[in-house]
Every structure is written in structure tokens, then in C-alpha cells.
Amino acid sequence: MTDAEVIPLTKGLAALQTALPFIVGCGSGMVATTCVQPIDTIKVRLQLADRSVLRVTTWSIARDLMVEGGILNMYQGLSAAIMRSLVYGTMRLGLFSTFEKELARRARERGTTLSFGERSLAGVGAGALAAVVGNPTEVILIRMQTDGLKPLSQQARYSSAVDALRRIASHEGVLALWKGAGPTLIRAMSINFGQLTSFSEAKNQLQEHTSLSPPVRTAVAAGIAGCLGALISQPFDFVKTRLQNQVKTSPTVGLGSGELLYKGTFDCLFKVIHKEGLFRLYRDILPYFMRIGPHS
């Protein structure tokens, strides 16, 4: 092989190495998303329920979904969830791995190891960038999952994620696709901090201080990451769901006068805590943990 042939091959391998974290993130995210979609649909409906009026549980919602449309009804919005995974999931995992490797390289040049603070920076930065780009897919997913809660005359009945994207942008304006961007951004940063950062740190600490086998270390680290990710990000996921579900023309989520029930993140937090109590923000944490756990 000549030098001229080696150079393109080297460049190709370098490009593949750069793209590999994004490819892995995309593939693993899509598999996890498909597996947990029923739990996510239940979680969203639980978060939208007014617990001061309604007595609902994970099992009652699952039963109602099955009665309404069978097992396929549990997969409402799957096309939007896959789109979300392609955009948000790919970016958050791929960018985290890329940032972490670059920071580790710089640490080696200084003669030190990657610190927890640097890992946290990689996680928070990756989550923030992925959230900004992926917010439209979050809005689409929430709308498709909750469409069945509205009266038949008000249901949009989106045929696919692309159809939802087009119709929301057309009827409500492009900026409607960035509804709830604030809590989505904070949630993504907190998930990445609690999930990815703690997973890497826990696995590293377990390797240094225990004699656990690699598979066990990975499982324990994933459990720690899932718990921390859920605890830190649950309130922001709750607010995100409430904000992104709002449509001015729907009296089921508005005030009946064309106004939105919640004006923003803090208004939503205040009204929910005032009406339903502080514990409401964490009341549905079990299905939320089951939702994000497989992504750990």
C-alpha cells in the first residue's frame, strides 16, 4: 500500500472514530425508546392529571389505554419518540462522549486525570446543546401522546411525527415548537449531570476501590446514574410536560378564553404547588425512573 493510499484510509478511520459515539448513541437510544414507550405514555398522562380532583394510578391509566385501543395504544407517538431519539438522544450521548474524550486528552497533557467537575461540564454542555436542537421533537411527542385525552372534536389525530411537526408549525407558528424550552433545557442538563456524569464517575470509582467484575460495575453504576438522574430532573420533566401540552384553542388545557393556563416555568411551578402540593412534582417518579432507567 502506497503513502497516498494510507492517508485517505487514516482520515476515514479518524472520521469513523469521531462518528462512532453518535452512531452508538443513536442505536442504543432507539432500542431503549421503543422498549419504554408504554411507560413514557403512562408517565405523561400521570403528569397531566389534576391529582387534587382525579384519583389515577399507573395501573388505572395502563388499563384505560388497553381498553381504548389495545396494546398498540400504549405506543402512542412512537414515531415522534424515535425522531426524538434520533435528534436528542444521538446528540446528548455523542457530544458527551466527544467532550469527555477531549477533556481527558487535555488532562493527560497536564499530567492529571479527568476530574468530576470536568465530567460534569461535559455532561451539562452536551445536554444543553441537545435540548435546544431537540425541543421540537419533545413538543411533538407530548402532543401525540396526549391527543387521545381531548374530546373527539378537538383531537388532531396526527398521522405521524412529520405530520405533527408540519401542522403545529403551520397552525401555531414555528416558535410553538420551542414551547417549554426552558424546563427542557434544565431537565436535559440535570439528566446528563445525574445520569451520564454520575455513571462515568461511579464506574471509575468502583473500578478503583472495589473488586467487582466489569459487568457488575456497569450495572451498579447504571443503577446509581438512573436514580440520580430521576431525582434531579423529575420536577423539570413535570413542568416541561405541562407547558408543552398547552394549546390556546383547547379548553381542556386552557382557561376557556384562549389564554394558556401557565405563562412559563415558574408560573407553572407556583400554580401546581399551590393547588396540588409540593409533593406533586415527585409523585410520579417511579414511572419516570422506569422511563429513563434503560437509557442509563
Swiss-Prot record:
<feature type="transmembrane region" description="Helical">
    <location>
        <begin position="12"/>
        <end position="32"/>
    </location>
</feature>
<keyword id="KW-0812">Transmembrane</keyword>
<keyword id="KW-1133">Transmembrane helix</keyword>
<comment type="similarity">
    <text>Belongs to the mitochondrial carrier (TC 2.A.29) family.</text>
</comment>
<keyword id="KW-0999">Mitochondrion inner membrane</keyword>
<feature type="repeat" description="Solcar 3">
    <location>
        <begin position="213"/>
        <end position="296"/>
    </location>
</feature>
<protein>
    <recommendedName>
        <fullName>Solute carrier protein FPSE_08119</fullName>
    </recommendedName>
</protein>
<keyword id="KW-0496">Mitochondrion</keyword>
<feature type="repeat" description="Solcar 1">
    <location>
        <begin position="16"/>
        <end position="102"/>
    </location>
</feature>
<dbReference type="GO" id="GO:0055085">
    <property type="term" value="P:transmembrane transport"/>
</dbReference>
<dbReference type="GO" id="GO:0005743">
    <property type="term" value="C:mitochondrial inner membrane"/>
</dbReference>
<keyword id="KW-0677">Repeat</keyword>
<dbReference type="InterPro" id="IPR050391">
    <property type="entry name" value="Mito_Metabolite_Transporter"/>
</dbReference>
<keyword id="KW-0472">Membrane</keyword>
<dbReference type="Pfam" id="PF00153">
    <property type="entry name" value="Mito_carr"/>
</dbReference>
<dbReference type="InterPro" id="IPR023395">
    <property type="entry name" value="Mt_carrier_dom_sf"/>
</dbReference>
<feature type="repeat" description="Solcar 2">
    <location>
        <begin position="114"/>
        <end position="205"/>
    </location>
</feature>
<feature type="transmembrane region" description="Helical">
    <location>
        <begin position="122"/>
        <end position="142"/>
    </location>
</feature>
<dbReference type="InterPro" id="IPR002067">
    <property type="entry name" value="Mit_carrier"/>
</dbReference>
<comment type="function">
    <text>Solute carrier protein; part of the Fusarium detoxification of benzoxazolinone cluster involved in the degradation of benzoxazolinones produced by the host plant. Maize, wheat, and rye produce the 2 benzoxazinone phytoanticipins 2,4-dihy-droxy-7-methoxy-1,4-benzoxazin-3-one (DIMBOA) and 2,4-dihydroxy-1,4-benzoxazin-3-one (DIBOA) that, due to their inherent instability once released, spontaneously degrade to the more stable corresponding benzoxazolinones, 6-methoxy-2-benzoxazolinone (MBOA) and 2-benzoxazolinone (BOA), respectively.</text>
</comment>
<dbReference type="InterPro" id="IPR018108">
    <property type="entry name" value="Mitochondrial_sb/sol_carrier"/>
</dbReference>
<keyword id="KW-0813">Transport</keyword>
<feature type="transmembrane region" description="Helical">
    <location>
        <begin position="219"/>
        <end position="239"/>
    </location>
</feature>
